[in-house]
Curated annotation (Swiss-Prot):
Disulphide linkage map: none
InterPro entries reported in the protein's UniProt record: HMG_box_dom (IPR009071), HMG_box_dom_sf (IPR036910), Sox7/17/18_central (IPR033392), Sox_C (IPR021934), SRY-related_HMG-box_TF-like (IPR050140)
Disease: Defects in this protein are the cause of the ragged, ragged-like and opossum phenotypes. In all these, missense mutations give rise to a truncated protein that retains DNA-binding ability, but lacks regions required for transcription activation. Homozygous ragged and ragged-like mice are almost completely naked, display prenatal edema and frequently die in utero or shortly after birth. Heterozygous ragged and ragged-like mice are mostly viable, but have a thin, ragged coat. Homozygous opossum mice display no visible phenotype up to 11.5 dpc.
Protein name, UniProt field: Transcription factor SOX-18
Taxonomic path: Eukaryota, Metazoa, Chordata, Craniata, Vertebrata
Length: 377
């Protein structure tokens, strides 16, 4: 065995290790245990070649995939697809271009080969097409049950989609956009004549279908309804007063203070007819003709009601309100729809405003008792 020079490895080993290399007692202890003793020279440490080396570990196939040898075996066992005409032509052409341009990258060579193949005419491609057909027939004979299996399987990405029926708690998704509720829909229809909102109101605990959907909501939860519209649509909002009392409680919001005061003091029939058709009885800005208002006695009709004053004396006016008033908080009588205010068109209501206010207060009390019983039940 060839020995290393005396100064080999002296600078690599720490001083403590060099001092312990020739310490006495190590060989004696080894002889007492029956182990072979190697003579270590104090001047020449053990060479790295004399140390035992463990064999190289191959990566585990189950944990790290195939090793180098196993990968080669798998590639040899895998049946390759037959080459097409371009592959047959590019097999030799790639070698020629690589020898001419050794500095070019393989991707650049592939682009050059693709351009050169497209520039060839049919006569120049024919021999390669025939060779590719021969290889295909030979491959079919050698492997009759061959089925192409790509190496990498394309994994379809799973896109999580939120189903339209699933909504977060506290959120209401209207089935129609807010534009469907605007005044430009074609006619002044009431809320119940608009397209239905689907099953969004099923969980709001509505007691009866006759009630307005807004009654089951809190004042702050009606945000999905359209915002205040243009001034020309104020008449339509006043017509829908029982379904949106917060918009039509004060007529000055739409018409201004002078006109609102005139509406409060004017006879009931004329302003209500004006509210139905538009401001001051003029037709609204709708392209389609409006349906006529409910039949009601005009100012001349009040004179015809005088002979029937004895009939109105036996009628309880609050009985009509508990069926016709559909809101919890009853708005002013000037903003009620035509058929609701019509129940109070009598000689007493028109002649005695104090009695009318008393009847209105009694009507509010009866309505509160009626709807509190409905909600609690």
């Amino acid at each position: 065995m060839q020995r290393s020079p005396p100064g080999y490895g002296a600078q690599d080993d720490p001083p403590s290790r060099r001092d312990c290399a020739w310490a006495p007692g190590i060989g004696a202890a080894a002889e007492a245990r029956g182990l072979p003793v190697t003579n270590v020279s104090p001047t020449s440490p053990a060479s790295p070649s004399s140390l035992p080396r463990s064999p190289p570990r191959s990566p585990e196939s189950g944990r790290y995939g195939f090793g180098r040898g196993e990968r080669q075996t798998a590639d040899e066992l895998r049946i390759r697809r037959p080459m097409n005409a371009f592959m047959v032509w590019a097999k030799d052409e790639r070698k020629r271009l690589a020898q001419q341009n050794p500095d070019l990258h393989n991707a650049v060579l592939s682009k050059m080969l693709g351009k050169a193949w497209k520039e060839l005419n049919t006569a120049e491609k024919r021999p390669f097409v025939e060779e590719a057909e021969r290889l295909r027939v030979q491959h079919l004979r050698d492997h009759p049950n061959y089925k192409y299996r790509p190496r990498r399987k394309k994994q379809a990405r799973k896109v999580r989609r939120l189903e339209p029926g699933l909504l977060l708690p506290g959120l209401v998704q209207p089935s129609a956009p807010p534009e469907a509720f605007a005044a430009a829909s074609g006619s002044a229809r009431s809320f119940r004549e608009l397209p239905t909102l689907g099953a969004e109101f099923d969980g709001l605990g509505l007691p009866t279908p006759e009630r307005s959907p807004l009654d089951g909501l809190e004042p702050g939860e009606a945000s999905f309804f359209p915002p205040p519209l243009a001034p020309e649509d104020c008449a339509l909002r006043a017509f829908r007063a029982p379904y949106a009392p917060e918009l039509a409680r004060d007529p000055s919001f739409c018409y201004g203070a002078p006109l609102a005061e005139a509406l409060r003091t004017a006879p009931p029939a004329a302003p209500l007819a004006g509210l139905y058709y538009g401001t001051l009885g003029t037709p609204g800005p709708f392209p389609n003709p409006l349906s006529p208002p409910p039949e009601s006695p005009s100012l001349e009709g009040t004179e015809q009601l005088e002979p029937t004053a004895d009939l109105w004396a036996d009628v309880d006016l609050t009985e009509f309100d508990q069926y016709l008033n559909c809101s919890r908080t009853r708005p002013d009588a000037t903003t009620l729809p035509y058929h609701v205010a019509l129940a109070k068109l009598g000689p007493r209501a028109m002649s005695c405003p104090e009695e009318s206010s008393l009847i209105s207060a009694l009507s509010d009390a009866s309505s509160a008792v009626y709807y509190s019983a409905c909600i609690s039940g």
